[in-house]
Amino acid sequence: MLFWGAFLADHAVFGQSTSNSLDSTAALTYWYQPSFVIMHDMAIRNRVWIPEEIKNRSSLFGIRHSRGQGDFKAAQGTDGLIQSQLYTEGKTDWRKTSFWGRFSYDRSAEDSTALRHQSRWNVDAPLYFGSLRKNKYSRETYKLDAGIQRAFFDAKLPISLGIDYRLGSHYSNNDPRGDIKDMNLQFELSVGHNLPTLSYHIAGIWGYGSERVNVGYKNDKYTTNTEDPLYVNWMMNGFGSASERLKEINYNDIIHRKGVGAHILLKPNDRNKIYFNSRYLNEEQSFRRNDNSKQTYLSLNDYKKDIGSIDFLWSRQMHRKRLLRVALQGQIENGQDFNYSYLANNYTYRRHEISFKTQLAVHQYLFEGHAGMYKTEKKDGVSGNQMEFDQVKLGLGLNRTFRLGQSADIIGTIGYTKQWSPSHNLYVSELNTGDFGKQILYQDYLYDTAPRNSWNMSWVWGTHHAKNNWSIQLQMDYQCRGNLVPIDYTLSSVPGKNWFLGKLGVSYIF
């Protein structure tokens, strides 16, 4: 009662600047108040809107430490996570050109992860190595994102360029030892037209990436092991179709990406802004093992995926310091492989999702509601394995800004989300699927269909001087599941009851 009372008590607090200009908004409010964060994140996903929704000459430098612990996880998840992040972001305008950039360095350690050596960026790919033995994984990831826009002909013809670059290294420190290197580079070039109440942009997208995976053993006795099931290495090539792989445990995944995008902004009056963004991407992955042949490699699997997405956001400034935001996002993914062992398509993947979020700001309060529906299908043609499940999410949130004297604020947020699966089905072939594949399929099925309740709470303390501010962030997330659906297979482990994640960060705003 005291906790909710602190949120609902009526006190004078610092809120949005009286100016309608984004650049005059207090820096702490812009970076951490959810009604600004939702606009900021939309502009980062769609770089053509950087001049509209990114605060100029405000930069952020921060460090964050996270710890996660629990046994409610997917088959290839982790029991424990320790992560540290260093990041910086900012935007400036120079000679009629907008420049935005963000850099981050992440270092994490995962405890007790099994069944897949992976970068965690390519989770639906059909080919990977894994074992029943639990590993400790260390990961390092560098990310550099940028956006540039210059408007020509009296600001009527904007040309924008978005760049995303990622470089990662992932390795385990116990047998079987995985060593994974990944990179991704993507460009999006846009040309637009600005009118008094309408702006639109057409974009072309090109990307390239790769993953290099090697698995080995420090202890030589495991290199020819076929007796101890924990140390046997398996190669998955499909959905549950796995075979033992005792030598040449490596592959390269070459990724090519191309697509188009469209971005529209409507400004019917000075109180309303309506953004609509859409994209289509075609992604092609080629899994290869290097050899001494004339071609220099052996093709293992080609995986192609079509991705269509929409990103809608409506912002309305109402009377009496009230503000409404409505966001809608949707995505459709359709993937299928060409398996060179069968010279035919074997694996198919489909994922449809739509999510809705609304925010209503009234003075120092922000009320939020969100909902989402998700449908996933995975099939393996040779074995006959098939998994289908629907997921529904509903949630509520409350945010409040508290004034602490003349130079500091606290921004508090609490939220609750409920998720369940109204429809699901799993078929696993007893004859064509070994224990390794069954452990993955059944554990994931239990995890994805489990009803769950999630609670989150975050607090941000920060100063709001004209320049040079500090903030401290604390976040806690807790998730617990309900009853698991019944299955007719005995697993070595099932998803546990709980998962907890805590984050603590410090940032300097300048």
Segment roles from a protein language model:
Residues 81-102, 181-208, 315-317, 390-399:
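Transmembrane beta-barrel strand/turn architecture of Gram-negative outer membrane proteins
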Residues 140-235:
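Internal, well-ordered domain-core segments that constitute the primary functional module
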Residues 19-26, 196-197, 497-510:
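Outer-membrane beta-barrel "beta-signal"
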Residues 11-111, 125:
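N-terminal, post-signal peptide beta-strand-biased segments of exported outer-membrane/organellar beta-barrel
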Residues 117-151:
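A broadly used, surface-exposed interaction patch
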Residues 69-83, 135-137, 168-182, 249-253, ...:
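Outer-membrane beta-barrel proteins
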Residues 17-22, 49-59, 90-101, 150-159, ...:
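Short loop/turn motifs that connect adjacent beta-strands in outer-membrane beta-barrel proteins
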Residues 120-131, 230-509:
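Outer membrane beta-barrel transmembrane domains
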